[in-house]
Amino acid sequence: TVVEAFEERYEKEQITQPRQIDGKFGQNDLKESVLKKVDLSKKLDRETYEKKLDELQKKLTLLHSEIYAKRIPVVLAFEGWDAGGKGGAIKRLTRALDPRGYTVNPTSSPNDIERAHHYLWRFWTKMPKDGHIAIFDRTWYGRVMVERIEGFCTTQEWQRAFKEMNQMEQQLVNHGAIVIKFWMHIDKEEQERRFKERQENPDKQWKITDEDWRNREKWELYEQAVDEMMVRTSTVNAPWVIVEGNDKLYARIKVLETVVDALEKRLDHNE
């Protein structure tokens, strides 16, 4: 009966309680950590940074016009550690873009309307029109990070999310979109330094919350979750780009270079 069907579904989809470290979290086929192999010593001096920044932003301005003319949509997804430099990188990108041709979509906890839909719905509705750029400051990958670790979704939900997100991105690519996903990576010591700097600067105190400090206590869990996420969702058509972010100047230039290179390659291919 209909009632029995509902009861059976309810039993299968019980929301789990926030999970604890039990020795099983993050057990997967990874032989070594993706993040721990990243060289965070990479740096850029201010003079080189300013020169590259000017060159890349001028290129990006022209490329933005070209992708608009050719109706190519672009999705730029930013994830990373708290205080990892997402906002700074996005700011240097958008300064080169025509305001009429892009949107920046900050992602926070879903509201009541969003919770009433499939978790990807709120992201699908913000995907770019042809020829436009959509930038996401945090993304659908929260499903396999914060929602997984804090118990905001069931085990079945986050496990199947890898395939669902790959499929969504492939659909965008099939439509002609360029999809690039950035992980802004810093080490735990650099994060602590930036947190303290924010606390001590009245102009930046709004950027730091008690939740940010609590999340640091689960650094190792997040690291395991990110490693698995990278391996299972970095594809040829929608790759993850790990940005070495301990040096902000280096990180901003790497993001710009990655976007410029991707747009140039697509436009060359289309000619």
Task: Give each language-model segment a name.
Residues T1-E271:
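Glycine-rich phosphate-binding loop of ATP-dependent small-molecule kinases
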